[in-house]
Amino acid sequence: MNAKTLLLAACAGLTVAGAAPVLAQPDVPLIPRQKIFGNPTQVAGRLSPDGKWLSWIAPRDGVLNIFVAPAADPKAARPLTAETKRPIRQYFWSPDSKQILFINDKGGDENFLLYGVDVVAGAQRALTPFEKTRVQVVGISSEVKDRILVGVNNRDARWHDVHSLDLKTGKLTPVLINTGDYAGFLADEQLVIRGATKSRSDGGSEFYRVVNNKVDAQPFEQVTLEDSQTTSPAGFTTDGKTLYWIDSRGRDTAALIAQNVATGAKTIVAENARADIGGAMANPKTGRVEAYAVNYLKNEWVPIDPRVKADLDFLKSKLTGEINVTSRTDADDKWIVAVDPVTAPTTAYLYDRKAKTLTKLYVTRPELEGAPLVAMHPVEIKSRDGLTLVSYLTLPPGTDPDGDGRPNKAVPMVLLVHGGPWGRDAYGYNSTHQWLANRGYAVLSTNFRASTGFGKKFISAGDLQWGTKMHDDLLDAVDWAVAQGVTSADKVAIMGGSYGGYATLAGLAFTPEKFACGVDIVGPSNLNTLLKTIPPYWEAGKVQFYKRMGDPTTPEGQALLRERSPLFRADQIRRPLLIGQGANDPRVNVAESQQIVDALKAKNIPVTYVVFPDEGHGFARPQNNIAFNAVAENFLAKCLGGRAEPIGDALKPSTAQVPHGAEFAPGLAEALARK
């Protein structure tokens, strides 16, 4: 494997629906938004492959940049990059430890380019200096130090051609020109392309061998639509003799499979009846899997290698919280370990495997140490048709004195819906949960059908169910919370981004009496126009979208998508709505928000619309995220009666524009006047 850590990224109870909601204890301090959503102090620590350097992301003049320090002297850190607009959020070390490579886009357009910075000299250069191009890393190896493989879609925006990138000269050499409509490529540790994948007409995939940069005429593996979200190759061992798969074929949950490349024989390495195998730790020298992750209610690392088992046992004995190994040297003598206590900010440590010592490197948000952060409670909720919905509940501080995961009296609640929809909510520190709980709300995040991590049947149960059974799962979660005494039926808001934004619009339009208000962030309102405006580089996944959502190329599909689109039932919306949108969003075009705002305006239905001209699918710049959340918490306070930090001057450093409805959000018009 060419990555040190492979990411694959009962309801009985007393009904108190009529009880008056109780808010958080008044003596609980209000945590300032800046402390929760401002820049972290340090994050994303990495060790260079040779172990001589430490790196991390930290603010420089208010923008997240990369810092480096000698591993022996972390206090001698210096900034390596000097980004002034977009924060750097993804980076990695070159195999020779001489450069740090990072990707960034412009204004949230997701046209990510690759940059390299010399660690000693500090010289930075664009390694893929193209316009309207999105780079992919195809191969990076601990065996080949002087180059990597990248995919670049500057020839045809739909498909990536594979190039070899010389890390010293920056020269790009074509390796495989993708004229066969292949969705992706797989390289081994010698940076030889060994596999290619292509979409099938049923929404599944087929996998081809590649020999001498020529793709075989016939596939060697087939994956149907049912397995398409849960089956893919995961990487080779260093000797190239074993190919690992995450594979749900012949089972429900995805197992970790080892395939003998020469014979094709497959061996089950790990499987779990309740959850997919969600990740693996591979030895940086051999590429062999040494531990795997299972994430049902919580993420659990299960060791295979006895030495790694001893390491994980030691770490568990010394650290309290969710433990993740985030970086390993090539010699595998040093690790960076992150621990998430949930009720405190994440801390990173340098772990010396031989000496069995832990050295504290940093706390991601030291300003939150000692803050009134609260526990997250995993719960299982039954849907009306018998599915188990793994969910996470956070309660306001002071409302659960016995710690049983239920408040002593009902409190207002925010149903926080994840995006994707092919993603999931998980256990761990969650800034939005903590923020809303601090303001006096219970927060419930539910993995509705179509969420990933719980097997292919659970995903497929969401096919063609946007706004219907997927929405029913959210309604069932609210009913569970009411029945459990968590909240009362008239004090529930719905909020989310991307699919969660769609769910918010659907909640207010399809079930107009269910929610007291809604906060939609970059959510689509018209599923037909959503599918017509997806980015060109999503071409390979388009058929799967059509099979799982509805086909906009057929009359029947168009009718289904129209029926499930909140835009066409906007006149049913009765409750307050706040919409946030990035103007450069390549996934959910700004028109998705604009058209429902226009429809509501035409019917004189109140809506507040906040747009950020320098953002895309979400708000990457902390100034903008804080500004929107300032509006949101005051909006929710009016709707649900919780606490709020006044908007104040939160909009001043942001690019927030409010084309419509400032008068419907408390304090917004005044904040705009001061901007």
Model-based region annotation:
Residues 1-8:
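Bacterial N-terminal signal peptides that target proteins for export
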Residues 446-675:
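Active-site-proximal cap/loop segments of hydrolase catalytic domains
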Residues 56-82:
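Beta-propeller domains
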Residues 20-24:
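Sec/Tat signal peptide C-region and signal peptidase I cleavage site
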Residues 9-18:
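Bacterial N-terminal signal peptides
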Residues 26-61, 65-66:
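Mature N-terminal segment immediately following signal peptide/propeptide cleavage
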Residues 364-493, 497-498, 503, 525, ...:
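Cap/lid segment of the alpha/beta-hydrolase catalytic domain
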Residues 38-40, 61-66, 83-89, 95-390, ...:
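Peripheral, non-catalytic segments that deliver or gate enzyme domains
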